[in-house]
């Protein structure tokens, strides 16, 4: 089966299961299975897909139909122009959370007029998306700390810190429990506020 035919099949299956953006999702999924960029699919649309890759593609289509988010299948989510590793140990960074980063950066700009360096805490960091993004934009103008109660979430956040070549410092803590001695110019937080019984429907 040709790549273009596989994309058409995937799109139709997702459409029948009321999954929106089915063309985009199908292409992202196939690119993930093949380990290529989406542009490759356009250039090689007439190429034959081997049986092994087709089986993997079908398996992942079934995961989508059964409610597994694309980001947990590909282990990737773009946020603030950066790529973040995500798995079931963290919530998927949402586009509207970028507003928090943007507003924090505005506040940082004001504070930097008065301070040579600012200290920021991202409380309940999860994937580390907010902390890593802030450190990426501010660089050596800031010291960014990130905390979470979950060891597994911190492992993901540390992975993203390394992946994006940032220098966030991590603290395992239940809210302020292990960071009471620290003082910060800015504390930012976007804790999990979604009811656990609806997470799989996001």
What are these regions (language model features)?
Residues 32-107:
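Conserved AdoMet
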Residues 99-201:
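Conserved SAM/SAH cofactor-binding pocket of Class I
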Residues 7, 11, 58-61, 101, ...:
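A generic alpha-helix structural signal
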Residues 5, 21-24, 52-56, 95, ...:
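Generic recognition of short, well-ordered alpha-helical interface segments
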Residues 1-57:
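A short N-terminal interaction module
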Residues 18-22, 37-38, 69, 112, ...:
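Secondary-structure boundary/capping signal
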Residues 14, 34, 41, 49, ...:
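Generic leucine side-chain signal with a strong bias for well-ordered alpha-helical environments
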